[in-house]
Amino acid sequence: MAVSKLLRRRYIVLVISASALVLAGSASAGEGKIALGAKMYDKWFKVIGVPKPEDTHKSLPSSNSKKKGNATHRCKACHGWDYSGKDGAYATGSYQTGITGVRAFAGANPADVVAILKDATHGFEGAMLAGDMAAIATFVTEGQVDMDKYIDRASKKFTGDAAQGKEYYATICVNCHGADGMLPKDMAPLGEVANKNPWEVLHKVLNGQPGENMSGLRALPAQVAADVGAYAQTLPTE
């Protein structure tokens, strides 16, 4: 099915469900929109249900020869899980691009971010609906977490309370990830992921996993997610 047809179908669904979002209340709808935008920052094409891009994004710097295809169309691919781009975890490694992060847009006008998403560099106009871009803009301007408050950049260790995180994990996470973090089987052990890339884990614990039945903890204090991350780092890595 063509992307345009999928987008039209999604537009109808969004119109029908608009009243439900209003009835949910402005506060919860706001957190929900932020979490939606955060999941789209992660993997927008998975969230909106369109075919994943097959080409390499035209704006990926030629200096990066390690990444290609749909991975290069994800916001996080250049701007990072820590939202700091070249000044954060992506200063080195396979995702190094020299591109700046989005931290400077915290508190900015969402319309400015939408305009950037539509510009020639990003080229997302026509790839997603206006509401989708608005959700990303809401996350970028209103939903970024200062990850340096919860993760020590040098050691990659969460600064949360692992003992408290164990209690949260046992009541929120265990059914899907298992007591030892070894589920689902098609995912690397949670302990391994949490220790290798704590910024990704914090982003997903807060906002959820694109295309999966994983709810984010966005409506709760970010410290709860940091505590969960601290406990996850104690789980087996293999």
Regions found by a protein language model. Give the residues of each.
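Bacterial N-terminal signal peptides that target proteins for export
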Residues: A2-L14
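Extracytoplasmic electron-transfer domains, predominantly the class I c-type cytochrome c fold
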Residues: G32-I34, W44-G49, K68-V140, P189-E238
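N-terminal signal peptide c-region/cleavage motif recognized by signal peptidases
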Residues: A24-S26
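Sequence/structural segment immediately N-terminal to covalent heme-attachment motifs in c-type
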Residues: G30-W81, K157-A179
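Bacterial N-terminal signal peptides
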Residues: V13-V22
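Short, solvent-exposed loop/turn and secondary-structure capping segments
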Residues: K86-A91, D148-I151, K185
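Conserved small-residue-rich
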Residues: T159-Q209
